[in-house]
Amino acid sequence: MRIDRIAIAIKDAIEKRCFLPALAMSLIIPDICAKYDYPDIYYKKSKYKGHSGQGAAYAKWYDENIGNYDIDPITGIGILDGRSCWKLRCEFLHSGSIDLDDFMSVADKHITFKLISSQFSDLNYTIGGCSSVRYSKDKKNQDIELDIVNLCGKILAVLEESYLKDERFICETENKELNYIEYN
């Protein structure tokens, strides 16, 4: 299957305001790219932040391509890191859930994670709507609101600007059979 068809499908879903299918498709892109970029971690031959395997490779890919740069301008806090994005992927694709509150919370701080969409959740507004991190007045609680289209747009931007311009990546990923045929 041509990997660019996944990008087209995500954009089509967003255009039709079908954000959950767009999110599901977007969350598989880091899997594909991480397997290509970090095969040693993916196949458990080396580690990233003490972990190995598919999740560790996914987390490293997300951190290096998005997470390390996706900082809330007001609080200076990262919106989503690689481990949390991997957890979001697993919860959403395997359980139909986005409950990351317990996973993201630490001993002295409760974090509430929400996926959002708005009238500005559209790829025509650059990369999508607004995401934010807010603290409670006592700084013990934190709300993270992640715009679905914003996340999808960032993942798509990395795919389109890096990987879809890499002939070796295209050959390796398109060499796999998906047995998908579109009849018109």
What do these predicted regions represent?
Residues 1-4, 8, 52, 56, ...:
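Generic alpha-helical secondary structure signal
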Residues 1-23:
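Charged alpha-helical initiation segments
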Residues 15-18, 34-38, 93, 97, ...:
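Hydrophobic/aromatic-lined pockets within catalytic cores
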Residues 19-26, 30, 82-85:
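Short runs of predominantly hydrophobic/aromatic residues within well-ordered alpha helices
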Residues 28-79:
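Flexible secondary-structure boundary motifs
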Residues 60-169:
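Long, charged low-complexity segments
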Residues 165-184:
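Sequence termini and other peripheral, non-core segments
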